[in-house]
Amino acid sequence: MGLERLACVVQGVGSLFDVDTVRNITNKVSEIAGKHYGDSDKTDISLRVITDHIRSTVMMICDGVIPSNEGRGYVLRRLLRRAVRHGKLLGIDKPFMSDVASTVIKESGGAYPELVEKQKYIHKVIENEEASFNKTIDSGLAILNDKIAASDGKELSAADAFQLYDTYGFPIDLTLEVLEEQGMTTSREEFDRLMNEQRERAREDRKKMGDLGWQ
């Protein structure tokens, strides 16, 4: 995105978000959400997060990255899911990322023609991941909020955080972000220990099933 950083100088603006091509993406999110940049600090943060993450998302998918649980695919998945959650914070209750991606492609397609060539594929990847995450986020957030309400207001138990991940598929990084917003914490070290124990149990179960297959 070096061209847009150069545009900061050419257009005489102090922030990447004030460059016209980037501002148009933010305006698209504002239009969908019915919110305006400058309404509040929380609104501005969410608008910036979505704008930043959808730009990165579109470029990564165009480069051949797909959402997964490891490597660059995990980074992409986190970007997409964090943007979707900030959409929820803005009151957006329908799939919207593909619409915003269209604006990214429109604004950047001249400099990056491959975005236009691959736009159908880009939309498909985004739509599939957003649909998958929407099934998780609403129920997960409701359960997390219940657990926060029942806590001491300072720390969520690692066992609760792990249950959200293991049983409901709610990502730990999203749990940590919600807790931070509430001024709370959880033990990542204890969460990782529980995760490792679960993986070890799964390995043992697979081994037992394999042994049974030879009997």
Please identify what each model-predicted range represents.
Residues 1-215:
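A glycine- and charged-residue-rich anion-binding loop/surface
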